[in-house]
Each structure stands twice: as structure tokens, then as C-alpha cells.
UniProtKB/Swiss-Prot annotation:
One biological process term in Gene Ontology: isoleucyl-tRNA aminoacylation
Binding site for Zn(2+): C892, C895, C912, C915
Enzyme Commission no: 6.1.1.5
Organism: Neisseria meningitidis serogroup C / serotype 2a (strain ATCC 700532 / DSM 15464 / FAM18)
Highest taxon of source: Bacteria
InterPro entries cross-referenced by the UniProt entry: aa-tRNA-synth_I_CS, aa-tRNA-synth_Ia, Anticodon_Ile_BEm, Ile-tRNA-ligase, Ile-tRNA-ligase_type1, Ile-tRNA_ligase, M/V/L/I-tRNA-synth_anticd-bd, Rossmann-like_a/b/a_fold
Co-factor remark: Binds 1 zinc ion per subunit.
Species classification: Bacteria, Pseudomonadati, Pseudomonadota, Betaproteobacteria, Neisseriales
Binding site for L-isoleucyl-5'-AMP: E563
Gene: ileS
PANTHER family xref list: ISOLEUCINE--TRNA LIGASE, MITOCHONDRIAL, SOLEUCYL-TRNA SYNTHETASE
Protein name in the entry: Isoleucine--tRNA ligase
Enzymatic reactions: tRNA(Ile) + L-isoleucine + ATP = L-isoleucyl-tRNA(Ile) + AMP + diphosphate
Cofactors, names only: Zn(2+)
Domains: entry comment: IleRS has two distinct active sites: one for aminoacylation and one for editing. The misactivated valine is translocated from the active site to the editing site, which sterically excludes the correctly activated isoleucine. The single editing site contains two valyl binding pockets, one specific for each substrate (Val-AMP or Val-tRNA(Ile)).
């Protein structure tokens, strides 16, 4: 008996089904680094149009977390896809290296008792160690970039250019010095920027306090009354009793309606909309009478006594007063609130600040001198009770500003700081706020809702406090007049001279500078060096100038900034403000893309206490970095990204589908040489031409839509669907018979391989931006060998086809696929009851509408191959219907079809006539399937 197994074209795949990624990826990385892949790519891409994604610098402190991994993976997918789209897309990774967290770590490791120069030296060393640690993990994720020459905000050149950016803003006229209330962290001992503030719930005392009116006759007149007997109070409500020693006024809303109410306590002034709730808090249900009503503008300039200090308190009108909660009257302490400051400034009230930088009251403050503001709260409540001016006291849980580093409550505190003014007219007569809002309009957002979010933040943000009272940071290199506080008239020129020194020696050049080196002897008598450093957000917000504008391979403005959604109030905003406030006069980016935060499968934040933290190091060590990359790409990053072991296992299934498809494709291309064996398109079997069209359409969707629009989850879904539906469940299922049973060098088989070659080459290029390791592994086989890279090539060029012919081809095979699905469904009951095993054991009689029947009949004898049955007949009817039955033919032991011609050819007793032709003669021909 003849063994026909050796006559079928079953080839071994050079692409194993098991990726073994976790073990193999590090070796690939080593090889790519040794081959200088990134540097070669820069040479190959030279002269192409540029695409610049500017890296938002992560902070150089601690191991990378899963959020870092998502961010870098998304950036890498974009860089790779843009490269394959024909752009020169260099990627320069960066790190944020100055600031308090590093100071804190150095203090923990080395203590505080050392010269400041040594302290800064240790900060620089610590930051460099952290950069090296994080860099290793980013590279392990497959992120392609200039890792040998990243940018660091502590590079001497970058520090110098950050100083130059300060000079730009100074020359533009937006920089000023002022004593304003700013968010102040008592643990940091410094002011904080907007982006350094986070909000958490806090329990605070909530109190109602009466301010006794001085002149009840004037109060009566304001309410249209002839007179008032007894005491009268303006009642305020506050959750910060500690600010009362700084209270300098009470604010009323000009259009708010107020009532004068007679109560057992005396006459109370309360907002009409809040009076009922307020009186309940005071326990007044009887003996109440509403005496009169008036509006807040009539109360303006009335005077009261402070509730426990000897201080005159005027009544002001403020736009910030609402009737959402409280009493409708607001105690106003300009040292401890921006709105308070603004309204007092309007009335010419000079700011009084009784709280020092340690959060303690100065010695002149009665009863609470030397106490912290938090310690003072109960003392102040006791004081109010003694004076009889405390109407109610309770506890309230509310959202409150906290330091993002220390997680401790912040206070507003007026300090002398340097600001970038939002509403100050610059040298060009325009305000920074107006420029920034215009810049938002000129920016493209992904997702689109980012526009409204950033615009609202810019519209509502205060002036940017850019000075810090720290040691490890880029210095504000100004010379300030000792008496007037004015900057030296030659500040612009002096800044540049200092920047040149910093470029050589780093920021220590400023701290060690003797002012006599740059100033005349006379100027030295009148000017001092400023000791403040800059907000770290100014450092990172200036990198578009210090990095993008300076590095030869980059172009300004950047095409894209991509960060987490919290950066609307962080890096996106600080970069926009420095861009708009400088001579560039615009945002330093054309597009902004934001991604959500990573949560667990239940939507909870990652937390060590919950035990749901998924570390990227654990993922790539267990599953491989390509699985982490596929997870990041397959998740809609516009919302939260859920991750867990179970989710990663599901992602692994998708990866396996792609990998198994590639393994099959490579097996059946292992004896195919595209130069010698390819079949011209016009001579290809029809279904092969159709499959190539499907692959080209997939490429058009990914290369023309999903990758350019950054919708990677659609790309992954489409790739997996193409592998499982178009290929696995349809084309490859049909193709196996032709690949395995026709003659190895026949046109029928070479046509199939030609289609597979186009499909495989395109598919490898399409997956490569996401599955960078798998893509390169596959390209080693189908590309130019180990020294070649998938990144050295642009999207696959498919053979062209007449548009009309293509449309007809797709229409025809779409109908055939529909018929095949109906046939498969009709056979299913026969398989379920074991009447047949495979579909080849069945025959099908198809009734179809005329057009579909025409398409099916056009395939003639080859219809059975397209439908995966041993026999198929077609007749015309009103709708699609299929009758399936078991074949009464005999099974061919070579092709497994059931036919009535097994043994019909002498010498081939166990195989069908077709197989006899393929084994011993010229072989069959195919036209359609």
C-alpha cells in the first residue's frame, strides 16, 4: 500500500508557535543595540518629512510603574508607525531631574548637615542613578530611542537654556514680583504650582461667626429702616478658623438679597436663600422675625468689629460671593485666599499676613503666637465663645488641597514670589491668558474633549508662581535691588552671561558666583543675587526650547505631546505658557494626546495596601514585553486602562492567534522565492486575488486611519479579526487543500504562495509598531535577514488592480462567503449527531437568489473547494437555503475528499482522480479556488 503522506506539501515553519518572549526578548535587544539599529534608522530616514514626538520627562525617582509603561509604549507605537509611514521620526527620551523629592531622598540618605554645594552634587548623583535604573526598564519594553543621548533637565546645556527661557519671558514683560497668596506646603517650606496640588477629603471645623456692626443706624438705613435696637451682626461661615486672625473685611454679593432677622442672639444679617438653614444651625426656631430685606450693594462700606481682635472690618462687594452654602457673607483674609486678595486689592486694603513660612503665627498675634495654624483652630473657637461671637460649630468632610508629595493639607499664604502674569499685558500688548486660549484653538486634541478641559483650566488658572525656596533646582539668575526689589536694568544681558557659565559648569556656576564678576563695584553695593530656584514645571515646560529647539535632529514646534490626562494641568499647560510667553508666541506642539490611568479589573486605582499593583517588570518577566505592548494597544486609552493577570491572559490569547497565523503563513512560504516563483496578478487564482485585496484593505485602514489617528485598539481588533475571520476561518481554511495537495511548483500553489507572500509581508509590517519583538522576529524570515529591520521599510506595496474589477471581485466573494457560512451552519447538526466528522464528508444543495447563484455556479467544479464540501449543487430560488447530507462517496486517503472516483486511475487505488493527477501526472489547474 502506497504511503501518500510524502506527496503532500506539509512544510515545517521557521517561525515557532511558541514565542517564549520573556526569555528571548533580552537577547534581541542586545543584538539590536550592538547593530546600532536606532542610528542606522536615522541615516535611512534622513531627508524624509519630520515627525517629532517630544517626550514628557518622567521624574527621576524610583522604579517605573505601569503608568510609565503605558506612556512609553504608546509613544513607541507612534514613533514606529510614523517611521513605517515614511517619516523621519527621531525619539529623544528625557528625565525631569530637579526638585524636592530628590532633595528629600538625599536628606534621608546623607542628612542635612553639609555645604549646599555638596548637597547639590549628591542630588545630581542620585538623579543620575535613578535615570540609569528607569532607562533599563524602558529599553526592556522595546522602546526605540536615542538612549545613549537622552535629555536631562540637569544637563548643563539644558539648565543654561532653561535660564535663557526665563530671560525670554522676562523680555516679553510677563514676569513680576508680588506678595500674593499662593498654595503653600508647610512640609516643603515652599509654594506649589497648580500641577503640584491634589485634592483629597479632609475633616475641618465649620463655624458661623458674628461680626458686630459698629453703626446700627447706618445698618438700618441700608435696610430702609428708621432705626435698630440692640446688637446686630454680619454672620460669616468658614471651614478655616485659623484664618480669622488675618480677617480684614467681610464680602457681600452686590446682587444677593440679604435679610435682617431679629433672633434671640440679636439682629443677624444673612442671605435670604441661606437664612432658613443657618437659623436651624443656630437652634433658633422661636422668637424670629424678618425685619427687612436689601441687596448687597447697599451694605457696601458698612463697618464692623473683628470678632475677637481690635480691628475695623469694612463690608466689601465681591464677585466671588455665592449662595451655594454658608451664610452668603464671606470673611475676607487677603493673605490666605486669591479671591480675598483680589477684592481687597480692588478696595486698596493692604495685605496683613500673621503666618510665617513654618505655618506658625508671628509673635505679634495675640493668644496664638508661635502656634501652628492647625493647633490654633481649637484656641480660636474658644476665643470666639468667650467673646460671644460663635453662633455654631460642627465638623465637615470636604475636598481640600493637599501636597502631591507629602499628602498633607496646604494653606494659602501670602509670600513674596515671582509670578508669570496671566492677565498682565506683555511687551506686545497682549495678555498671556488670551494668547494661551488662542493656542488651544490652534491645537488638535486626542481625544477631542481635551480641548474644553485645557481651555477651562487656562481660563480659570491664577498667575503662575515660578519661584521656589529650594536648593536643587535651576536658579532664577537675577540681580535684585536691595531696597526697591527691582531687577537690574541690564538683566537680559546678565542672564545670558550667567547662562554661558552654567553651560560650562552647571547651576553651581550661579550659586558659587561672586556678583563682582559680573557687576560693577557700585552695582555690587545696591544689588544682591536672587537665591530662589525655579518651579520644576518651568524646567520641564521649557524643554521645547532647551531640547526640541536646540537638538539638530528635532524640529520646533513638536508635532505631538502625549501624556496622562493629569498633564492638562501639568506639562501640557506649563509648556503652552512658556511657548506663548516667549518670543515663539505659540504652543510648542501641534497635537495633544492624553491617556487615562491604569486601574485593576474592578476599576480601582493601583494600591500597595489593596495589593492590586501590577508592576511592568513582573509582566515582561512572566509574559514578555510584547504582551504588555499588546495590552496597552488593545485598550481604549481615552478612558481608564484595566489590567490584571486574567486580562493579560486574554491578551495572550489574541497574541497566540496572531502568532499561529504567522507560523502557518511562514510554513507555507518556506519553499517560495518571490523573485523566481511569484505569479503575476492577472494569472493568480481568483480567491488569491480576493485575499490580497482583503490584506490591502486592512493595511489601508491601519496605515491610513488607525495609526495616524492613534486609535490602536481598533488596529488590534482589526488585525485579530483579519487573522481569525478573513484568514483562519475562511481563506486559509480553503487554501490548505491547494497548498498541500497540488504540485509543489504548480501555478495553483505558486498563486496561493504569491498571495501569502503579500499578506505576510504586509501583516508583519502592520503588527511591528505594536509587537516590536515579534515583528522583528518575523522580519528576519521574510525581510533581508538579521542585519535588516522591519523599521527600515515602509508599508507594503501591493499589486494594483482595476478599481471596477476589484469592486466586482469583492462583491462576488462576499456573496460566496455568505453562502459558505450558510453551508457551514447546515452541516453543523450533522456534525453534532456524528453523521459526519468534517465538512468534507458532506454534500450541499444550495438554493440562492439569482445573482448569488450566478456567482456560485461560475466556480464550476471548484465550488466544492470554496465551500469545503465534497460536492455542491446550486439552484435559483427566492432566498438562501442549504440542504446538507452525508456524502455517499469514498474518502481519498490523500486529500480526504469524499468522491466517486477513488481508485479510478490504475495504480492509484486509494486516491481520487484529482490526486492521481497531482501525484503522477502534470497536476490539476485552478482558476477560482
Amino acid at each position: 500500500m502506497t504511503d501518500y503522506s510524502k506527496t503532500v506539501n506539509l512544510l515545517e515553519s521557521p517561525f515557532p508557535m511558541r514565542g517564549n518572549l520573556a526569555k528571548r526578548e533580552p537577547a534581541w535587544l542586545k543584538s539590536w543595540y550592538e547593530q546600532k539599529r536606532y542610528q542606522k534608522l536615522r541615516e535611512i530616514a534622513k531627508g524624509r518629512p519630520k515627525f517629532i514626538l517630544h517626550d514628557g520627562p518622567p521624574y527621576a525617582n524610583g522604579d517605573i510603574h505601569i503608568g510609565h509603561a503605558v506612556n512609553k509604549i504608546l509613544k513607541d507605537i507612534i514613533i514606529r508607525s510614523k517611521t513605517q509611514a515614511g517619516f523621519d521620526a527621531p525619539y529623544v527620551p528625557g528625565w525631569d531631574c530637579h526638585g524636592l523629592p530628590i532633595e528629600v531622598m538625599v536628606e534621608k540618605l546623607h542628612g542635612k548637615d553639609m555645604p549646599k554645594a555638596r548637597f547639590r552634587e549628591l542630588c545630581r548623583e542620585y538623579a543620575a542613578e535613578q535615570v540609569a535604573c528607569q532607562k533599563k526598564d524602558f529599553i526592556r519594553l522595546g522602546v526605540l530611542g536615542d538612549w545613549d543621548k537622552p535629555y536631562l533637565t540637569m544637563d548643563f546645556k539644558t539648565e543654561a537654556d532653561t535660564v535663557r527661557m526665563l530671560g525670554e519671558i522676562y523680555k516679553s514683560g510677563y514676569l513680576y514680583r508680588g506678595a500674593k497668596p499662593v498654595q503653600f506646603c508647610l512640609d516643603c517650606g515652599s509654594s506649589l504650582a497648580e500641577a503640584e496640588v491634589e485634592y483629597k477629603d479632609k475633616v475641618s471645623p465649620a463655624i458661623d461667626v458674628g461680626y458686630p456692626f459698629k453703626d446700627t443706624a447706618a445698618l438700618a438705613a441700608a435696610f430702609g429702616l428708621a432705626g435698630i435696637e440692640g446688637k446686630a451682626f454680619a454672620v460669616i461661615w468658614t471651614t478655616t478658623p485659623w484664618t480669622l486672625p488675618a480677617s480684614q473685611a467681610v464680602s457681600a454679593g452686590a446682587d444677593v438679597v440679604y435679610q435682617l432677622i431679629d433672633t434671640p442672639k440679636g439682629k443677624l444679617v444673612l442671605a435670604k436663600d441661606l437664612a432658613e438653614d443657618a437659623l436651624k444651625r443656630y437652634g433658633f426656631s422661636d422668637g424670629i422675625a424678618i425685619l427687612a430685606e436689601t441687596t448687597g450693594d447697599k451694605l457696601e462700606n458698612l463697618h464692623m468689629n473683628h470678632p475677637f481682635l481690635e480691628r475695623d472690618i469694612p463690608m466689601l462687594n465681591g464677585d466671588h460671593v455665592t449662595t451655594d452654602a454658608g451664610t452668603g457673607l464671606v470673611h475676607t483674609a487677603p493673605a490666605h485666599g486669591l479671591e480675598d486678595y483680589a477684592v481687597c486689592n480692588k478696595y486698596g486694603i493692604e495685605l496683613y499676613n500673621p503666618v510665617n513660612a513654618e505655618g506658625k503665627y508671628i509673635s505679634e498675634t495675640p493668644r496664638v503666637a508661635g502656634m501652628s495654624v492647625w493647633e490654633a483652630n481649637p484656641v480660636i473657637l474658644q476665643w470666639l465663645e468667650e467673646t460671644g461671637n460663635l453662633l455654631a460649630s460642627s465638623k465637615i468632610e470636604h475636598s481640600y488641597a493637599h501636597c502631591w508629595r507629602h499628602k498633607t493639607p496646604l494653606i494659602y499664604r501670602a509670600t513674596g514670589q515671582w509670578f508669570v502674569g496671566m492677565d498682565k499685558a506683555g511687551a506686545d500688548g497682549k495678555t498671556l491668558r488670551d494668547k494661551a486660549i488662542k493656542a488651544v484653538d490652534d491645537t488638535e486634541f486626542f481625544p477631542s474633549w481635551g480641548r474644553a478641559r485645557l481651555e477651562a483650566m487656562i481660563e480659570g488658572r491664577p498667575d503662575w508662581v515660578v519661584s521656589r525656596q529650594r536648593y536643587w533646582g535651576t536658579p532664577m539668575t537675577f540681580f535684585v535691588h536691595k531696597e526697591t526689589g527691582e531687577l537690574h536694568p541690564n538683566s537680559a544681558e546678565l542672564l545670558e552671561k550667567v547662562a554661558q557659565r552654567i553651560e560650562e559648569k552647571g547651576i553651581e556656576a550661579w550659586f558659587s558666583l561672586d556678583k563682582g564678576e559680573l557687576l560693577s563695584a557700585e552695582d555690587c553695593e545696591h544689588y544682591d543675587k536672587l537665591s530662589d530656584t525655579m518651579d520644576v514645571w518651568f524646567d520641564s515646560g521649557s524643554t521645547h526650547y532647551s531640547v526640541v529647539k536646540q537638538r539638530e535632529e528635532l524640529d520646533w514646534p513638536a508635532d505631538l505631546y502625549l501624556e496622562g490626562s493629569d498633564q492638562h494641568r501639568g506639562w501640557f499647560q506649563s509648556s503652552m505658557l512658556t511657548g506663548c510667553a516667549s518670543s515663539m508666541g505659540r504652543a510648542p506642539y501641534k497635537q495633544l494626546l492624553t491617556h487615562g490611568f491604569v486601574v485593576d479589573q474592578n476599576g480601582r486605582k493601583m494600591s500597595k495596601s489593596i495589593g492590586n499593583v501590577v508592576a511592568p517588570q513582573e509582566v515582561y518577566n512572566e509574559f514578555g514585553a510584547d504582551i504588555l505592548r499588546l495590552w496597552a494597544a488593545s485598550t481604549d486609552y481615552s478612558g481608564e486602562l484595566a489590567i490584571s493577570k486574567e486580562i493579560l491572559k486574554r491578551v495572550t490569547e489574541s497574541y497566540r492567534r496572531i502568532r499561529n497565523t504567522l507560523s502557518f503563513l511562514f510554513a507555507n512560504l518556506s519553499d517560495f522565492n518571490p523573485i523566481e516563483d511569484a505569479v503575476q496578478q492577472a494569472d493568480m487564482v481568483e480567491i488569491d486575488r480576493y485575499a490580497v485585496v482583503l490584506a490591502r484593505q486592512l493595511q489601508e485602514r491601519l496605515a491610513g486611519d488607525y495609526y495616524p489617528r492613534y486609535t490602536f485598539h481598533f488596529a488590534v481588533k482589526d488585525i485579530v479579526s483579519f487573522c481569525s475571520e478573513d484568514l483562519g476561518a475562511f481563506y486559509l481554511d480553503i487554501l490548505k487543500d491547494r497548498l498541500y495537495t497540488t504540485k509543489a511548483d504548480s501555478r495553483a500553489r505558486r498563486s496561493a504562495q504569491t498571495a501569502l507572500y503579500h499578506i505576510t509581508r504586509s501583516l508583519v509590517l502592520l503588527i511591528a509598531p505594536i509587537l516590536c519583538f515579534t515583528g522583528e522576529e518575523a522580519w528576519d524570515i521574510i525581510g533581508g535577514g538579521e542585519e535588516d529591520s522591519v523599521l527600515f521599510h515602509t508599508w507594503h506595496e501591493f499589486p494594483t488592480i482595476n478599481e471596477k474589477a476589484e469592486a466586482e471581485l469583492v462583491k462576488k466573494w462576499t456573496a460566496i462567503r455568505e453562502a459558505r457560512e450558510a453551508v457551514t451552519a447546515a452541516i453543523e447538526p450533522l456534525r453534532a449527531d456524528k453523521t459526519v466528522g468534517s465538512s468534507l464528508q458532506a454534500e450541499a444543495e444550495i438554493t440562492a437568489p439569482e445573482e448569488m447563484a450566478g456567482y456560485l455556479n461560475a466556480l464550476g467544479e471548484e465550488l466544492r473547494f470554496a465551500l469545503l464540501v465534497s460536492k455542491a449543487e446550486v439552484k435559483v430560488g427566492s432566498e438562501l437555503a442549504v440542504a446538507a447530507k452525508a456524502s455517499d462517496g469514498e474518502k481519498c486517503e490523500r486529500c480526504w475528499h469524499y468522491t466517486r472516483d477513488v481508485g479510478a486511475v490504475a495504480g492509484y487505488e486509494t486516491v481520487c482522480k484529482r490526486c492521481a493527477e497531482n501525484v503522477g501526472r502534470e497536476g490539476e489547474t485552478r482558476h477560482y479556488a
